[in-house]
Amino acid sequence: MRVPINTITPDTPSAEVIGWAHEIRDLGGLAFLLIRDRTGIIQVTVPKKKVAPEIAETIRAISRESVVRVTGTVKPEGKAPGGRELIPDAIEIVSLSATPLPLDVAEKVPAELDTRLDNRFLDARRPRVSAIFKIRNAVQHATRNFFFENGFIEINTSKIVAAATEGGTELFPIAYFEKEAFLNQSPQLYKQMMMAAGFEKVYEIGPIFRAEEHNTTKHLNEATSIDIEVSFTDHLGVMQTLEDLIRDIYQFVDKTCSDAIADLGLDDFAVPEKGFPRLPYSEAIEIASATCEEDIAYGDDIGTAAERAIGEEMGRLYFIVDWPSSIRPYYAMPYENDPEICKAFDMMHPRMELSSGAQRVHQHDLLVEQIAKKGLNPENFEFYLNPFRFGMPPHAGWGLGAERLVTTMLGLPNVREAVLFPRDRHRVVP
């Protein structure tokens, strides 16, 4: 019976493994075959004069990345991966790989990112790449555990909508019978509707779509968003929830993904310290204007260069708070004593924005006023506004980019590396 490679120790008497031929070295009278499965690598040592002739013939026929089955005796070997080797009694080629390979899974020959993404099924066999997705799996597992333990209800909202939920134009139109429809850019309005339904604490992990013509290392046109909405709290409450979640995720990854962390060479992986600094927008602009190459003034959005300048100053995860109402969405709650400022925030990594959120406007008339101030027609938002007429509780929430979280956590150079099959303005296959 086949066993995972990582369960085989130097003391294991015998084993059957099935995996991919990672490397093959034939030294004449002695051959070495490295077999890889998702749990690790084991060395198969073939002394040709001491094994059956058919085993030596099979070894010669194996091409790299073929799927092979090996049954044999395990022996301690200090120079081999894991301190053990497998001496074969039988070798079978289960599935022969074509040659040449589009890319080198053993990573001895570097490949461009486009080549890797074009051949993602091969690229994902590389231990460093599979480590990324093992950690991403742990991130999403930890996220669901955190929300379940804190009394949240998971929801799944529609990704086909009739209008722009955020009021913008960055939408992908789709053919939907005789109607006009779009791919949803955010579950924002649906989350708020569930506050009117009395769910009080909801979350969703799902795709969002943005028709933005970016071509950068941090933007995608299809991304995974982790969203929450909470009743009877304010922006400060959900900011604390966000900080607690981030630290919980890091702790879970640190505890459960040591092998993947090692595969990525992350010797400095560490859980962020408590108490993410809270930097007012006005102070963030002062930092950026003093050090940024681009001109920036109060009332401007914070672009890439400004993010970089502020991030270098802060040096850790932090919040930018108290944004001008003029540059935040219509549903962000303004301060009662200063309506020009709203209860909105971004959570930032020194490299990029990770999350955006706010306390929401819950009063129907104020929300209509806010929508109109943004130059939008409230009549186009009737399906959204209607719940606010029937007892909407105070509430707040945020959205967190899963890919950006993984990218910054692991120090990846490009957000596409954190997605199995990324979608950007140039890529729709595979």
Swiss-Prot record:
Cite the Pfam families for this sequence.
tRNA-synt_2, tRNA_anti-codon
Which residues of the sequence carry a binding annotation for Mg(2+) 3? E353
- Its chief place of residence is cytoplasm
The signal peptide stretch is: none
Positions with a binding annotation for L-aspartate: E166, R210, S356, R360
Q: Which enzyme type, at the first EC level?
A: ligase
Give residue numbers for the site Important for tRNA non-discrimination: P81
List the Gene3D superfamilies hit by this protein, alphabetically: Bira Bifunctional Protein, Domain 2, Nucleic acid-binding proteins
Q: What does the Swiss-Prot or TrEMBL cofactor note state?
A: Binds 3 Mg(2+) cations per subunit. The strongest magnesium site (Mg1) is bound to the beta- and gamma-phosphates of ATP and four water molecules complete its coordination sphere.
Residues binding Mg(2+) 2, per UniProt: E353, S356
A molecular function (GO) held by this record is: ATP binding
Q: Does the keyword Transmembrane apply?
A: no
Name assigned to this protein: Aspartate--tRNA(Asp/Asn) ligase
- Organism of origin: Methanospirillum hungatei JF-1 (strain ATCC 27890 / DSM 864 / NBRC 100397 / JF-1)
